[in-house]
Amino acid sequence: ANALYLVNLDTVPVVAFATGHSEAITTSTSTSFTGLLNDNNFEVKEFNMLTDEIPEDASIVVLGMPTTDYTSEELSKLEAYLGDEKMASSRTLYVMTAPNAGWSSMPNLSSFLAEWGMEPQSQEVLESNTNNTLYNMPYAIFANVTDSVLSKTYDNVVKVQAAPVKRLFTANNDISTYSVIETSDTAYLSNDEKVLETPETDTYTILAFAQRYMDNQGKICANVVVDGCAADFYDGSSLLGNSTFGNKDVTLDLIKNLTGTTDTRVGLTVNQTQTNTMDISASSAVTWSIGMMLFTIVVPVAVLVIGLVIFLRRRHL
């Protein structure tokens, strides 16, 4: 049925995955995410950032947790992509990251993101209040979706082993930054050097968003997103494919917001999230079983795999 809508679209939004930097998240390791995009009539492409040009029709360029730094030539490509004043629609750079992603070894890409007011951190966000965790696991956090970009209310959005993203400014010249997904004020950051009995708690941004208007009406924008929870997109996590959690709805709504598409123009398989409820369709026993499988087996394995990929690729540099 979705194919019928493609006939009526002037253009099909394209999400292009960049390769060439030993990315942990690619089209082959994030089939749940790419399947979600395809089901909602987004076209998925892949290109090599070093040897290829960025696809001209790309609405979103994904950097799926790169593990090596970008060259000045590659960053010039990204600058040209985002800075094209003749663009017919909004464009977005979507950067995925995770704890211990090795940003200290990527100074060029870090500086590029800093110009957009965002700095990925290498620590892990943990939760001190068990009421804000799933099954008392401090690394499985019930996160809050702010109304700065998305206007709906989302329930059961869980972020597992996420890294914080520091906003360097709220507004600077023509760039504004926003916190889209964040923790409660009882979260704290991991410290590998020592375990603190009373850690300092605060609210931390997990997904940050920067925007620059490219026209006088604010209808065409250049956007940069830094998402500290790359585990969401890895096939082993299953978070995007499980309707118990709100991750799928948040992700799809954000992608549609970034591309300027709506439910009526793109796709038919849009599951609207219940607002102001905690309505989980499964029984408590079934939900408990799903949760335990996800967060004691599936997600830890997924994160370990991502970590192993990063380690092995860096070892062979």
Regions found by a protein language model. Give the residues of each.
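Short, surface-exposed patches at the edges or C-terminal ends of soluble domains, predominantly
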Residues: 1-317
